[in-house]
A protein has these predicted regions:
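Small-residue-biased structural context
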Residues: 1-218
Length: 218
């Protein structure tokens, strides 16, 4: 089975590090296979596949997508609370780096504001899922006779996912794709590594909802 890039990002920690190294935009390419993307870009698919195989960590264990309760619980536990916790810390780090290194030519000016804006949008988005969409999905699994209309709520969530993808591109642009200048401090290093992890998690989160969870109710 040919796996999509989004499947790889969702299943294997560290995949985005390899993709960034080869300048593969994993957010826009999530629905394409590695062969498709490398063919268009003229990259060596075999080399990239070997680098992916050499990643030190094994795959995450995803729950059975047919068990809606377990799948939703996984998303809540693995992503929703994690995003909230990490964004709060990253905003503080970004403010510190911008304040201390504002005169550096490669300082990520505007990153703290971009992270704060992402926090507000994600908080609103995840609250709608937690309070409205996910409970309705659980009810539909519990009661097969339920006729709760979910097409429009899911459509709205998909549109907001597109907005999150735009926010991810903004973070990548502000950080030069998370490329650290030489000799920067530990806070700057932690900021970029933490933001890169946030992006990796968010891409995987969106992929699991768009490609696995939502289609079961559309």
């Amino acid at each position: 089975m040919i796996r999509k890039i989004g499947d790889l990002v969702a299943s294997f920690p560290g995949v985005t590090l390899v993709l960034r190294r080869h300048k593969i935009g994993f957010c826009c390419s999530s629905n394409k296979s590695l062969d498709e993307v490398t063919s268009v870009k003229g990259l060596d698919a075999g080399l990239i596949a070997r680098e992916l195989c050499d990643l030190p960590k094994g795959p995450l264990t995803l729950p059975d997508p047919n068990d809606i309760n377990a799948f939703i619980d996984f998303i809540l536990d693995r992503y929703h609370q994690t995003h909230c916790d990490e964004l709060a810390e990253l905003i503080l780090l970004a403010r510190k780096v911008e304040a201390v290194h504002g005169d550096h030519p490669d300082a990520p000016a505007g990153l703290a504001d971009a992270l704060f804006e992402m926090t507000e949008k994600l908080d609103s988005h995840m609250a709608k899922e937690e309070m409205v969409l996910f409970p309705a999905m659980r009810e539909m699994q519990r009661n097969s006779a339920s006729t709760i209309p979910l097409i429009m709520p899911i459509h709205c969530m998909r549109e907001e996912h597109d907005e999150h993808a735009e926010a991810i591109h903004k973070l990548q642009k502000l950080t030069n794709n998370f490329t650290l200048p030489d000799g920067v401090c530990g806070s700057w290093q932690a900021l970029y590594s933490g933001t890169a992890k946030l992006v990796e998690d968010l891409v995987a989160h969106i992929h699991l909802e768009n490609e696995i969870l939502f289609p079961r109710f559309e």
